[in-house]
Amino acid sequence: MSDNEIKNEAPKKLSLQRRTKTTVADGKVQVEVRKSRKIDTAAVKKAQEEAALKAKQEAEAKAQAEKTAAEQAKAEAEAAKKAEGAKVEATKKSAPAVPVMPNSKPKAAAPKAEQPKQEKALDPEKEAKKKEEAELRRKQEELARQKAEMEAKRAAENARRLAEIAREEAAENGEEFEDDRFTSSYAREADRDNDRRSEANRGRGKGGVNKAKKGDREDKNERNADRRNQKDVKGKGKNAKKGSALQQAFTKPVQVNKADVVIGETITVAELANKMAVKATEIIKTMMKMGEMVTINQVIDQETAQLVAEEMGHKVILRNENELEDAVMEDRDVDAEKVTRAPVVTIMGHVDHGKTSLLDYIRKAKVAAGEAGGITQHIGAYHVETEDGKMITFLDTPGHAAFTSMRARGAKATDIVVLVVAADDGVMPQTIEAIQHARAAGAPIVVAVNKIDKPEANPDRVEQELLQHEVVSEKFGGDVQFVSVSAKKGLGIDDLLEAILLQSEVLELTAVKEGMASGVVIESYLDKGRGPVATILVQSGTLNKGDIVLCGFEYGRVRAMRDENGKEVDSAGPSIPVEVLGLSGVPAAGDEATVVRDEKKAREVALFRQGKFREVKLARQQKAKLENMFSNMTAGDVAELNVIVKADVQGSVEAICQSLAELSTDEVKVKVVGSGVGGITETDATLAAASNAIMVGFNVRADASARRVIEAENIDLRYYSIIYELLNEIKAAMSGMLQPEFKQEIIGLAEVRDVFRHPKFGAIAGCMVTEGVVKRNNPIRVLRDNVVIFEGELESLRRFKDDVSEVRNGMECGIGVKNYNDVKVGDQIEVFEVVEVKRSI
C-alpha cells in the first residue's frame, strides 16, 4: 500500500463544529465532562454471532416446513391425475370394438392422433377442475413463500435487538479505567496526535512503517465502530443526528422528576408553587377544578395543600411547625416522684368588697394602704404559713371591671377560688363574673362573707343571692363552704384558712418537686434599674438561680430571684411565687414559663414564636382591611382621639387599653398609638407630638428629657393612680370631640283672633299670646288644625302702635308674617328657638 493510500485511510480530523457545540469566535472553549469506558467487544461479537445463528436456524426450519408442504401438495395432485387416467382407460375398454381393415392402416392412425382432443371435448368439466386445482396450488405456494420471508425478517430484527441489548449491558458492566477529566476539544485532539506519533515511532523501531500504518487503520476502525454504535442507539433514518466521537451520549429522562413537597400547617399558593417547581397558575387551575377559587397570595390549610400536591403527582411530607418547640420540651427532666404541694388560692370578688384587706390581715402586713384608693391595681402573689406549719399561696386579683383578663389568668393558675362578698352589699356584677371565671377554670369555690361586723350586714341575703347563680351552700345541701369573716377585726380568719386546707385535702394536690421547673407568668413589668421583671408562679419542679427559662416570646438565664417581700432566694419549689430577673424582654402575663437545657435552642424557639405571631398578626390585619373596606369610606367623618398609655405593670396596660377600646363610638374612636411598661421616655413624648396624642401615665412618671420635649411641644400629659379617674377624663375628652346636637324648644304660642289688611305689611294677624313668650327675632311656624302649613320668621311684632321685641303670655299683639299672607282666624303661630345640647359619652 502506498503512502498516499495510507494517508487517505488515516482518520481525518473532524471539524470543530462537529466536535464541540461552540466556536472560538468569542474566545470561549466548551469544557466537557466525560467518562471513558472499556467495552468488552468480544462479548458483543459473541452475542451477535449467537443471535445470527439462531435466526438462521429458525429461517431454515421454516423453509424446510414450507418445502415439505409443497411436496405433499404435489404428490396429492399427481395421485389425483393418475386416478383420472385410470378412469379414462376403463372408459376406453368398455367402448364397442371397431373392425379394422387390413388395407386401411392410415385411417386407423388418424383416430389415435385425435384421441386427446376427443377426450377434452368429451369432459370439459374435468378440465376446469384441473385448472382450479393448479391455481390453488400456486396461491398456496406464494402464501407460504411470503410467510417464510416475514418470519426471516422478524428473526433478523430480533437478532439485531438482542445484539444491541448485549452491547449496552457490556458497556454498563465495563470497567472504568479513567477518572472524570476536565479537558477541551483541542487538548483531546492533541493527545490523539501524540498517541499516533508514539505508536508510529514504536512501529518503525520493530517492523518499520507497516505497523504504524496498521495501528492507524485499527484506530480508524474503532472510531467507525463507535460511530455505528451511537447511530444504532440513537435510531436510524434520514433525520437521525450523527453522534460525535467527542460528545458523551446522555439519554434524556423520560419523565420529569417530581420532588417531595414539605408542607407546614399553613402555606400560601405562591409558596406551594415554588416548592412544587410549577407556576402558581397551575395550582390555581387545579384548585378551580376541585371547586376552590383562590388567589396567588391566599393562605390555604395543610389538608388542602396536601390534596393539591397529590393531585399534581407529588409526594407530600407533612411537617408540624412546632417540631423544634416539641423537641425542646421533650428534652426535660420531669420523671421525679410527685409529692404533696401547697394549694394556690385566688381571692376574687367585686371592687371594694375587702379582698386586699382580708389578705392583708392574713399576711399581717399593710398592703392595702399602699394601693391607691384602696383598689388593687395588679395581681399580688404571696405565700403564708399557717399556725400548724402548712403553707398556702394567695393570688390577689383586681376587682374592677377593667381587669377581666387579669381575673381570668388568676383563675387559670389557681386551685381554689375564695369568693369575697360584702355582707352589706350582696352579689354585684364582678361577683357574678368571678363565679364564671372559677367555673371556666374548674376550680372549687369557698365563699368568704366579709364585713359581718357592720350593723347592716346580712349573710343570709348573700346566700340567697348566690343560690340564684348555682352557688349552693352546705346549709342548703350543696358543696360550697360559706365562712363569715371580718377583715377589719380579724373575725373568722382561722375558719377560712381551715376551710381552704380542707378543700385542698379533698383535691389531693401533688407536684414534682425535683427536676426542671415549669410555671406561669402572673405579672411582668420593666424596671428601670433591673430590666424586665416577671412574677412567676412555679407549678412543678424547682426553679434555681442560673436556670435557662423560656417564657412565651422571651427567654433568658435567671440572674436573680426575689420573693414577695424583696428577699433574695436561690430556689423556689412548687406553688411558690418569685420575681425573676434576666429575661430578654417583658413576657406577657399568662405565658407559660419552662426551664430548658440549651439556651441556643430556647432562643430559636422564642424567635420562631415571634415570627409565627407576626404572621398571624399580619394575616389578621389583612383580614380587617378587607372586612372594613366599606366602613373605611366614611372614615373621614369619624374623629380620633390618639392616646399613649404607659403603666407600671403589663396587666394594667392591657386593662387600660381594653377599656379605652370599649369607649369608642361611631363618631369618636380612641386609638392607642403606643403602650408599654415603664416610665415615660423622650421617645414616647416625640411619638405623642408627632401623632397629636394625649399621654397617660398610670403609676409612672416622665424623666427629665421627656419633660423637656413635653414642655416644648405643649403635649397634654396626665398622671393617674386610679383607673376610675383615667376613664372618666378620657370620656370627657371624647365628649368634647362629639359633633354638637341641636334641639328645638317651643317658647311661645299665639292664637289668631282677627286678620287686618295693611298696604305696606300685607295681612296682619291680631293675636292673643296663650303660652310663653312671643319674641320678634325667633323663627315661627303657622299651624292650622295642628298641622304645620308654613315655617319662617316674623316681619313685625306690635303692641298697639308700638314695635316691641317680645310679648308675654295673656297679652294681645299684632303679628306680621314675612312672605306669607294667607293667615286665617283660628290659626296658631308657634314661636321656637334652636338650643345646642351638650353631648357626652
From Swiss-Prot:
Originating species: Actinobacillus pleuropneumoniae serotype 3 (strain JL03)
Organism ancestry: Bacteria, Pseudomonadati, Pseudomonadota, Gammaproteobacteria, Pasteurellales
PROSITE patterns listed in its UniProt record: G_TR_2, IF2
Function per UniProt: One of the essential components for the initiation of protein synthesis. Protects formylmethionyl-tRNA from spontaneous hydrolysis and promotes its binding to the 30S ribosomal subunits. Also involved in the hydrolysis of GTP during the formation of the 70S ribosomal complex.
Location of this chain's protein in the cell: Cytoplasm
Region annotation G5: where it falls in the sequence: 486-488
InterPro entries: EF-G-like_DII, EFTu-like_2, IF2_II, IF2_N, P-loop_NTPase, Small_GTP-bd, T_Tr_GTP-bd_dom, TF_IF2_bacterial-like
UniProtKB keywords: Cytoplasm, GTP-binding, Initiation factor, Nucleotide-binding, Protein biosynthesis
Sequence similarity: Belongs to the TRAFAC class translation factor GTPase superfamily. Classic translation factor GTPase family. IF-2 subfamily.
Location of the region described as G3 in the Swiss-Prot/TrEMBL record: 396-399
Region spans: G1: 349-356
Region (G4): 450-453
Name the record gives this protein: Translation initiation factor IF-2
Pfam families cross-referenced by the UniProt entry: EF-G_D2 (PF22042), GTP_EFTU (PF00009), GTP_EFTU_D2 (PF03144), IF-2 (PF11987), IF2_N (PF04760)
GO cellular component, as recorded: cytosol
NCBIfam families, per database record: IF-2 (TIGR00487), small_GTP (TIGR00231)
